[in-house]
A protein has these predicted regions:
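Structural motif
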Residues: 5-10, 38-43, 63-68, 125-128, ...
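Hydrophobic beta-strand segments of well-ordered beta-sheets in folded domains
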Residues: 2-5, 30-38, 60-61, 121-122, ...
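Short, surface-exposed amphipathic charged segments that create phosphate/polyanion-binding patches used
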Residues: 49-51, 68-82, 182-192, 352-357
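Flexible inter-domain linker/hinge segments
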Residues: 67-121
Length: 428
């Protein structure tokens, strides 16, 4: 889809604002903007207009104002259009390669659509947090997921009313002292933790924690997945899941990936949340999990095993681990495009790859970035997020039997909405 905007009687900042809001609205509706036509633009202003709009990374064509006189105006308009917007340039913008990139707005729109197409039930253990119930209200209004909110129904609804929320009553509310739920929950927890010698008294004490309580709602089948972490640490969210939901058969580590939504594409960064110093075997498993996450969200994975060395340019024990992980990954998934070890710039940029990794088809086109350890991964995703303005969705916890996802304690309402939708899709 192309955007056409008139610049008559508009200052440059007004034109920029109009274009920004228009692109945002079009992409939120699932449309990909391929180029911008600026009409009524005097030739002497064409350069400054194109310079102003260059930041959107789209082709811009400026068309001068054409006064209407008679029927001949149509022919004049067509001739003017062809002169200022050559047909080959417009057709080039329609090429498949130019329509492939996924923008953050389009990705979020698609995320909600996928979640709604096969509604699942997600439990929210932090019902007392304003951001959680605001996100819940948004999703319930649009009927995207079914929600179980843990906490006192009357207190949560009263707070929702104070915040102007109108759809919270569509959720199911689960009190933590409800014996009809608590009794079978205690029995199941004792069964699952029998090897640890858990008693009924210990189980009840454990279930006084909302994270444990919410996790057991998933175990018992009341919910398909869980989202927590807006007021609790990652450990408080992950520990119950590891103990009672456990990992998928054959999966060793649980890892945390972020979906990084850039201006023109989406990438996966891992592990940014869980594994402190993974060995080669664990790194290869994290890469496999991350490639599967990419596929689940419509991304054709091309994996880069990151290091300070590109294809042998540097040496050291850390490089050895990454190179061994790359070897294992190729053995486990011979059809998966992968390059490693590789530096971030050579993985990211085709221009850098042409010098540092000449002849490698994956270098410069990586969209699944596997960091060598948690320090690099956590710093890396936050640095890229803050410096580029990329939208970071996650972490997505990979490798669990059922989806449990952790929120940053600094998560915004939109982040929570995205994570709940993402969790629902994983449950499908």
């Amino acid at each position: 889809m192309f955007l056409a905007v008139c610049t008559i009687d508009r200052w440059p900042h007004e034109l920029d604002e109009t274009v920004h809001l228009s692109i945002e609205g079009m992409e939120a509706a699932g449309n990909k903007v391929l180029g911008i036509f600026v009409t009524g633009c005097e030739p002497r202003h064409a350069f400054s207009v194109k310079e102003t709009l260059a930041k959107y990374g789209l082709p811009v064509w400026t068309l001068p104002q054409i006064p209407f006189t008679d029927e001949s105006t149509k022919d004049l308009a067509l001739a003017t259009f062809r002169k200022n917007a050559p047909t080959d340039e417009v057709l080039a913008a329609l090429d498949v390669e130019n329509t492939a990139p996924i923008t953050p707005y389009a990705f979020q729109f698609d995320l909600l659509g996928k979640a709604k197409s096969n509604k699942k039930t997600i439990v929210l253990p932090e019902g007392e947090e304003d951001r959680i119930i605001k996100a819940a209200d948004y999703l319930l209004e649009r009927e995207i997921v079914n929600l179980i909110i843990v906490g006192d129904k009357n207190a949560i609804l009263a707070r929702g009313e104070e915040l102007g929320l109108k759809f919270l009553d569509r959720a199911r509310f689960q009190a933590m002292d409800d014996e009809n739920v608590l009794k079978p929950m205690v029995a199941k927890l004792c069964e699952l933790r029998a090897k640890k010698g858990m008693t009924e008294e210990q189980a009840r004490k454990q279930l006084a924690d909302a994270s444990y309580f919410g996790t057991m709602l998933v175990v018992l089948g009341y919910a398909d997945g869980l989202v927590s972490g807006s007021i609790n640490s990652t450990a408080n969210t992950v520990r119950p899941a590891l103990q009672v939901i456990k990992t998928k058969p054959g999966q060793k580590p649980v890892s945390g990936a972020f979906l990084m939504c850039f201006k023109d594409h989406v990438a996966v960064f891992a592990d940014c949340a869980i594994n402190l110093n993974p060995d080669a075997e664990q790194l290869s498993e994290i890469a496999l999990q991350s490639a599967e996450t990419a596929r689940a969200f419509g991304i054709d994975p091309k994996v880069g095993m990151l290091s300070y060395s590109t294809l042998g340019s540097g040496k050291g024990p850390d490089v050895d681990i990454v190179e061994e992980a790359t070897k294992l990954l190729k053995e486990k998934a011979p059809d998966l495009p992968v390059v490693g070890s590789i530096q971030f710039d050579a993985a990211w940029s085709p221009n850098v790859a042409a010098t540092k990794a000449k002849g490698n088809d994956v270098a410069g086109h990586v969209n699944v970035f596997v960091f060598p350890d948690l320090c690099a991964g956590n710093i890396g995703y936050k640095a890229v997020q803050r410096s580029s303005g990329a939208l970071a969705i996650g972490p997505v916890l990979q490798g669990l039997n059922k989806p449990v996802n952790d929120l940053s304690r600094g998560a915004l309402v939109q982040d929570i909405i995205n994570t709940i939708a993402l969790t629902a899709i994983e449950a499908q």
